[in-house]
């Protein structure tokens, strides 16, 4: 094997940190809001100071990005997802791109639906936790939006209607 190929393979493996079996975790089962079809499962795993978010969502608009956020209230009773209130923001930060250190705790990457309307996402985030504390996502709402997040419009990113809703539970 050529040294450059070996180096690339080793770098790729180094980035694949496995999830410890005893890692604190939470889970959310997304259900469609009124007149929508989106549904799926999202798992949250505490790995050190970061949380790995693993999402599998179906029933989305094909070949489109969909805003994806943790919301303040763990309440999907309204039928349209509005009962989850605004983005989870315990540190009183502005809405921003998920890679910014100055953002809502609930700001996450957009879900990118494939040609069949399915989206998968796996990312490590450093602002939220699964363990108890002010930035814990447990008991919060989780929303998939109809439109992409522009990562700048305050306070929501102009992500549109709420297609699916879940309450994040310890899991």
Q: What residue spans do the PLM features occupy?
A:
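Bacterial N-terminal signal peptides that target proteins for export
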Residues: 1-6
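N-terminal leader/targeting pre-sequences
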Residues: 16-65, 70-171
């Amino acid at each position: 094997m050529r040294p450059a190929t070996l180096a690339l393979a080793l770098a790729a493996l180094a980035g694949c940190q496995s999830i410890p079996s005893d890692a604190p975790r939470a889970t959310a089962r997304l259900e469609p809001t009124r007149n929508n079809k989106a549904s799926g499962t999202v798992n949250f795993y505490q790995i050190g100071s970061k949380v790995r978010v693993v999402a599998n969502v179906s029933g989305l608009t094909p070949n489109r990005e969909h805003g994806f956020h943790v919301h303040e209230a763990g309440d999907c009773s309204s039928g349209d997802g509005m009962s989850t209130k605004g983005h989870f923001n315990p540190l009183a930060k502005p809405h921003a791109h998920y890679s910014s250190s100055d953002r809502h705790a609930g700001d996450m990457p957009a879900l990118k639906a494939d040609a069949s309307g399915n989206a998968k996402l796996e990312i490590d985030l450093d602002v939220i936790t699964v363990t108890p504390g002010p930035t814990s996502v447990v008991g919060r709402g989780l929303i998939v939006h109809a439109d992409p997040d522009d990562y700048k419009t305050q306070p929501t990113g102009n992500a549109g209607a709420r297609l699916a809703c879940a309450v994040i539970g310890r899991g």
